[in-house]
C-alpha cells in the first residue's frame, strides 16, 4: 500500500510477551496499513522452550518491534505508547501497561485463550475468583473488550461477569499462501508413489509434545494402520515433555520403519512438510486455543 493511502488517523500498539511466527503476519499487515503508527511491544525474551520449537524469527528485531525488557529507555517508550496510542491490544503482558490508559477511558482490547483450561475445583476456586477480579473484573466499567482466541473464552469469562457483550472472535493469523492446487498435489507422497506396487501416503503431526495435545494418539493410529497392512510414512514434528515417551512407544510397537520424529524446526520448514503431507493429524482436546498450526495445515 502506498504511503499516501495509509490510514494515519489511528495509532495502534500491540503488547505481548514476545513476537512469534503466528503474530508476525498480522503485524506486517498492520504496518502495511498504518506504517509508523503501528508498534509491537515485547515485554520479555522468547522462552527457551519456544526457541527449541523453532519459533525464532528471521530477524533479531523488526523495525516496528520494541523490546521493552532490553533497556530502561525502551521500557519508558513502551509505557508511553501504551498511554498515547488510540488503541492498545494486550496479550500475555502485565496490566501495568494498560491501567494508566484505562483511567483515561481509552479503547483497550485484551486477547486470551480460554482461562479455565484446568477447570474449576474447590482447591483453585479462590485463586481463580481473585485472578478474575484483579485482571478483568475491576476494569469492566472501562472501554475494555476481549478478543477471544478460543471457542471457550467468552463463556469462561462470562461465568465471572466479565466481557458479557464485549467479546469478539480473534486468533493467530499465520501467513496465507496462494498455491496452485494441481502443483501442490503433485508434491504429495501419494502422487510420487502412484503406480508403484505399494503406494504410500504421508501423515503429519506438528506441535508441542505435551499431554493435552495427545501426540501419543498418532502413535496408536500408526500401530493400527501398520497391523492392517497400510503403506504410510508418519512424521511427528516438535519437542516437549512427552518426547522420550513417544520414542519409547515407537520402539516398543516396532514402528521405526514408518514413524519418524525429526525434532523441532523453524515454522518455514514445518510448512514445507505440510505442503508434502497427504494427511494432517490434529489431536488436541478442548484445552487447545485457536490452533494456528491447524490454520497453516488447512492453507
Cite the ranges covered by each PLM segment.
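Short alpha-helical donor nucleotide-sugar binding micro-motif in glycosyltransferases
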Residues: 264-265, 272-277
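Nucleotide-activated donor-binding/catalytic signature segment of Leloir-type glycosyltransferases, i.e.
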Residues: 63, 245-265
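Short His-centered aromatic/hydrophobic patch
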Residues: 89-95, 112-113
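Donor nucleotide-sugar binding/catalytic pocket of nucleotide-sugar-dependent glycosyltransferases
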Residues: 139-198
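Short alpha-helical segment that forms part of, or immediately flanks, the ligand-binding pocket
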Residues: 271, 294-299
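Acidic donor-binding loop of glycosyltransferase active sites
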Residues: 275-289
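Conserved donor-binding/catalytic core segment of Leloir-type glycosyltransferases
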Residues: 13, 185-186, 193-213, 219-222
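Nucleotide-sugar donor phosphate/pyrophosphate-binding loop at the beta->alpha transition
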Residues: 116-142, 185-188
Amino acid at each position: 500500500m502506498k504511503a499516501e493511502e495509509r490510514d494515519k488517523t489511528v495509532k495502534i500498539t500491540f503488547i505481548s510477551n514476545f513476537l512469534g511466527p503466528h503474530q508476525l503476519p498480522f503485524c506486517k499487515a498492520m504496518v502495511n496499513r498504518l506504517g509508523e503508527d503501528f508498534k509491537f511491544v515485547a515485554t520479555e525474551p522468547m522462552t527457551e522452550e519456544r526457541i527449541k520449537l523453532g519459533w525464532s524469527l528471521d530477524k533479531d528485531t523488526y523495525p516496528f518491534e520494541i523490546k521493552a525488557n532490553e533497556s530502561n529507555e525502551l521500557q519508558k517508550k513502551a509505557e508511553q505508547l501504551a498511554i498515547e496510542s488510540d488503541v492498545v491490544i494486550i496479550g500475555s503482558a502485565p496490566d501495568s501497561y494498560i491501567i494508566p490508559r484505562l483511567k483515561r477511558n481509552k479503547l483497550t482490547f485484551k486477547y486470551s485463550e480460554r482461562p479455565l483450561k484446568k477447570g474449576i475445583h474447590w482447591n483453585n476456586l479462590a485463586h481463580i475468583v481473585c485472578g478474575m477480579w484483579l485482571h478483568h473484573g475491576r476494569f469492566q466499567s472501562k472501554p475494555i473488550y476481549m478478543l477471544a482466541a478460543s471457542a471457550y473464552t467468552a463463556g469462561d469469562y462470562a461465568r465471572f461477569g466479565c466481557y458479557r457483550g464485549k467479546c469478539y472472535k480473534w486468533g493467530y493469523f499465520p501467513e496465507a499462501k496462494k498455491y496452485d492446487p494441481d502443483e501442490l498435489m503433485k508434491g504429495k507422497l501419494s502422487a510420487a508413489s502412484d503406480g508403484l506396487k505399494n503406494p504410500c501416503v504421508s501423515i503429519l503431526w506438528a506441535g508441542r509434545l505435551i499431554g493435552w495435545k495427545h501426540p501419543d494418539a498418532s502413535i496408536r493410529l500408526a500401530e493400527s494402520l501398520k497391523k492392517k497392512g497400510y503403506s504410510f510414512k508418519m512424521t511427528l514434528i516438535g519437542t516437549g515433555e512427552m518426547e522420550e515417551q513417544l520414542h519409547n512407544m515407537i520402539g516398543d510397537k516396532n514402528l521405526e520403519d514408518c514413524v519418524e520424529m525429526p525434532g523441532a524446526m523453524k515454522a518455514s520448514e514445518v510448512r514445507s512438510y505440510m505442503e508434502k503431507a497427504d494427511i494432517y493429524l490434529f489431536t488436541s482436546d478442548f484445552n487447545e486455543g485457536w490452533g494456528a498450526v491447524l490454520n497453516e495445515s488447512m492453507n
